[in-house]
Amino acid sequence: MESQEFLYVNRETGAVEKEPVCCSFAIKFFLETRLGRGVYSFLCKNSLFSRIVGRFQRLRMTRRFIRPFVEKYRICEDEALRPLCDFTSFNDFFIRKLKPEARPICGGSEICVTPADGAYLVFPSIKDVSLFSVKNQLFSLNSLLEDQQLASEYAEGSMAIARLAPFDYHRFHFPVEGIAGTPRLINGYLFSVHPLMLKRNLKVFAENKREITVIESKEFGKVVYIEIGALNVGSIHQTFAPGSYVGKGAEKGFFAFGGSTVVLLFEPQRIIFDADLVHHSAQGLETRCRMGQSLGKRFSS
């Protein structure tokens, strides 16, 4: 059994830290035992389980879980737009909105910002993604997008992956300004995006339920924005108006209870990712960022 410690770089301090492991007993059961692997496969391929968990988390009785969760994962309750006592269920807290000042948006039209709170990996060249795919799990852009023409446009492009842990703020935002198209739903399974699970199978990005939106941006070209559901997170909720102009940092939607992932694709020579993110990613280390921080700058020849 590989170590259940998962390290990341805290962007604000530069320190390497250990990520809290949610549901460590269940993860160990799913990874180490034959029965666990069978149960895990069944649960991920049967959306009924995620629907049941989702409904349970919307019950009023789950309010009792909010305070212990906040204390265990040291969540700053002062950032929330509403006090903890106002939330009607655990899921109501999970999809909470934050005060605008809690996540300032990095200014400048030449700056692309991080779309969500989470742990980031960036790949200046999508071709390099295979170098990170351990245990012979190969990455396929065509499988991710299920659109051969679109995949060909980004084969030489760049990619950013933001993995949201259960304790993260779970609303996601636009990284650039522009015209946002209509999301395209691709139904799929609901495999976990827990870091230890991703080490075993990076292909979950192309197997899980996901929604794809194309943003037409003057500064960054055509940006592909992908939300990927996970175990307990079958619900991806969009809150923006398709076909409308969206501002950088504007809310796009939210994930219901659980962990989840956002993937951004950029056309070739459109973005230069920030040096710290590139450096850490090359070492196989995620960088934990907050929504609205700089992700990279517009490419200029």
UniProtKB/Swiss-Prot annotation:
Pathway: Phospholipid metabolism; phosphatidylethanolamine biosynthesis; phosphatidylethanolamine from CDP-diacylglycerol: step 2/2. Is synthesized initially as an inactive proenzyme. Formation of the active enzyme involves a self-maturation process in which the active site pyruvoyl group is generated from an internal serine residue via an autocatalytic post-translational modification. Two non-identical subunits are generated from the proenzyme in this reaction, and the pyruvate is formed at the N-terminus of the alpha chain, which is derived from the carboxyl end of the proenzyme. It is found in: Cell membrane. Binds 1 pyruvoyl group covalently per subunit. It holds the Pfam family PS_Dcarbxylase. Keywords: Cell membrane, Decarboxylase, Lipid biosynthesis, Lipid metabolism, Lyase, Membrane, Phospholipid biosynthesis, Phospholipid metabolism, Pyruvate, Zymogen. The active site is at D117 (charge relay system), H173 (charge relay system), S260 (charge relay system), S260 (schiff-base intermediate with substrate). GO terms for biological process: phosphatidylethanolamine biosynthetic process. The modification Pyruvic acid (Ser) is found at S260. It catalyses: a 1,2-diacyl-sn-glycero-3-phospho-L-serine + H(+) = a 1,2-diacyl-sn-glycero-3-phosphoethanolamine + CO2. Belongs to the phosphatidylserine decarboxylase family. PSD-B subfamily. Prokaryotic type II sub-subfamily. Catalyzes the formation of phosphatidylethanolamine (PtdEtn) from phosphatidylserine (PtdSer). Heterodimer of a large membrane-associated beta subunit and a small pyruvoyl-containing alpha subunit. This is Phosphatidylserine decarboxylase proenzyme. It comes from Chlamydia muridarum (strain MoPn / Nigg). The gene is psd.
